[in-house]
């Protein structure tokens, strides 16, 4: 079992000079606007108000960093979470979209401390064209990607497995790399943390 010892806000940034300057291993959370990134981070950390949750799409317009202290099997880890602005917000102006895109791509391409990217997909909606483009982009830049199918509490158990199989085909990924998750029911919390620690846990030990 993985225990969250502490979780705290670190800083907000819009460009590299505002990024944290230490060597903590980072995980970025990406997904379309209003897919539930903030709710997922709150569920993972067990802190209901760590990240502000809004029903208004496009609310997150900066890179927001949070530090999480974890323990697994007596070994402590520290991971920094980076909450990125959502993509695909239809009501945003072209100028805002261009600014957000530059902010996100600069971080994803140049951040040396970025160990993995969690790509969040709505299990009912499925991968949007923006989701697929982002996945291709991350793979082209050799980023480790963990795909999380969120809001699975909206599906029955009988519908969930076939839907995950369908998602794996649509995204051209093995079924085992797509993790089901529910912020409402806290389903998949240990599995996501476990997958992240298995991927780069040694670099996150403290």
Swiss-Prot record:
Residues reported in the UniProt entry to bind Mg(2+): 38, 60
> Annotated Gene Ontology MF terms?
GTP binding; metal ion binding
Key words, A-Z: Cell cycle, Cell division, GTP-binding, Magnesium, Metal-binding, Nucleotide-binding, Septation
The positions annotated for binding GTP are 31-38, 58-62, 83-86, 150-153, 181-183
Residues annotated as domain EngB-type G: 23-202
Q: Which cofactor does it need?
A: Mg(2+)
- Note the superkingdom of the native organism: Bacteria
TM spans (from-to): none
Q: Which GO terms describe its cellular component?
A: cytosol
Q: One GO biological process from the UniProt record?
A: division septum assembly
Give the CDD domains listed for this entry.
Answer: YihA_EngB
Tell me which family the UniProt entry assigns to this protein: Belongs to the TRAFAC class TrmE-Era-EngA-EngB-Septin-like GTPase superfamily. EngB GTPase family.
Q: What does this protein do?
A: Necessary for normal cell division and for the maintenance of normal septation.
Q: Which NCBIfam families match?
A: GTPase_YsxC (TIGR03598)
According to UniProt, the name of this protein is Probable GTP-binding protein EngB
Q: From which organism does this entry originate?
A: Myxococcus xanthus (strain DK1622)
């Amino acid at each position: 079992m993985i225990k969250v010892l502490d979780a705290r806000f670190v800083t907000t940034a819009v460009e590299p000079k505002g990024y944290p300057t230490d060597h903590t291993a980072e995980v970025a959370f990406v997904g379309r606007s209003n897919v539930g990134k903030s709710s997922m981070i709150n569920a993972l950390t067990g802190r209901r108000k760590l990240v502000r949750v809004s029903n208004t799409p496009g609310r997150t317009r900066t890179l927001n960093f949070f530090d999480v202290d974890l323990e697994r099997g007596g070994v402590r880890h520290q991971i920094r979470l980076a909450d990125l602005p959502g993509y695909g917000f239809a009501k945003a102006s072209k100028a805002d979209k261009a600014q957000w895109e530059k902010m996100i791509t600069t971080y994803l391409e140049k951040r040396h401390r970025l160990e993995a990217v969690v790509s969040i997909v709505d299990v009912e909606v499925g991968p949007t064209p923006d989701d697929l483009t982002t996945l291709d982009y991350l793979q082209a830049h050799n980023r480790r990607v963990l795909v999380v199918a969120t809001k699975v509490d909206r599906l029955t158990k009988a519908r969930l497995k076939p839907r995950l199989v369908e998602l794996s085909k649509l995204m051209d990924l093995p079924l085992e790399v797509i993790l089901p998750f529910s912020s409402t029911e806290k389903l998949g919390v240990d599995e996501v943390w476990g997958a992240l620690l298995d991927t780069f846990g040694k670099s996150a030990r403290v």
